[in-house]
Amino acid sequence: MSNKVHLGHTARKRFGQNFLTDQGVISSIVGAIAPDNDHVMVEIGPGLGALTEPVADMIDNLTVVELDRDLVKRLQYHPVLKDKLTIHQGDALQFDFGQLQQPGKKMKVFGNLPYNISTPLMFHLFEFAEQIETMHFMLQKEVVLRLSASPGTKAYGRLTVMAQYYCQVVPVLEVPPTSFTPAPKVDSAVIRLLPFEVKPWPCKNVDVLRHLVTTAFNMRRKTLRNNLKTLLSDEDFAELQIDASLRPEQISVPQYVAMANMLCDKKD
């Protein structure tokens, strides 16, 4: 049997499918998620149910978002899960997670995410951060390092700044390729994202922040002065007490927010 087949399903490369099979890792992740009936529990990419089954076992209802029609069909006819699942067949990148919120209940979102969409999916989920209590994701280890990076490090970038603007970021555990079928060519890790109830550095317009950060990191090796010359002057940098000769990875999240807020003030 091909090493890409698990429980009779062949992993599809175009969907980035790698199925988690290590029971010890599964137990650790479920413990970190802490499933309960006080939140709307949402799984992205349930696959063959490695996390779905133990989580659903602890709660009354689990909402899942799955793109693969074959896997959706398996879930719909699953002897144990079918009565506990609310299944949405579709692309999580296009999905309106806001529709899942219930009165008085925030969401707990989790999943073993396809690595080929993990970064854009993070940005999509940040748009619903105010409706989410916690997020737990299995990701490529490199992405976890980017999410949790500190200023001045190679991993620090656009994803870091936006993730840490919206959330407290906590690495949970590292997972070797042998924990999956088929084994991915990269190491994996689990991350916990805790959206802030009150943001420590409030931004007047997050679209402005997003544009500023994207522009700053378009050319990582160049200085802020060069990358942001169409947005901020030397006088602006001086007023903010930010050294314009620094590179984008040397600037902290609150400094990016301060620059974005200055841009908002200029537009008013």
Swiss-Prot record:
Coiled coil: none annotated. GO terms for cellular component: cytosol. It comes from the Bacteria. It catalyses: adenosine(1518)/adenosine(1519) in 16S rRNA + 4 S-adenosyl-L-methionine = N(6)-dimethyladenosine(1518)/N(6)-dimethyladenosine(1519) in 16S rRNA + 4 S-adenosyl-L-homocysteine + 4 H(+). InterPro entries: KsgA/Erm, rRNA_Ade_diMease-like_C, rRNA_Ade_Mease_Trfase_CS, rRNA_Ade_methylase_Trfase_N, rRNA_adenine_dimethylase, SAM-dependent_MTases_sf. GO terms for molecular function: 16S rRNA (adenine(1518)-N(6)/adenine(1519)-N(6))-dimethyltransferase activity; RNA binding. NCBIfam families: ksgA (TIGR00755). This is Ribosomal RNA small subunit methyltransferase A. It comes from Shewanella frigidimarina (strain NCIMB 400). The lineage of its organism: Bacteria, Pseudomonadati, Pseudomonadota, Gammaproteobacteria, Alteromonadales.
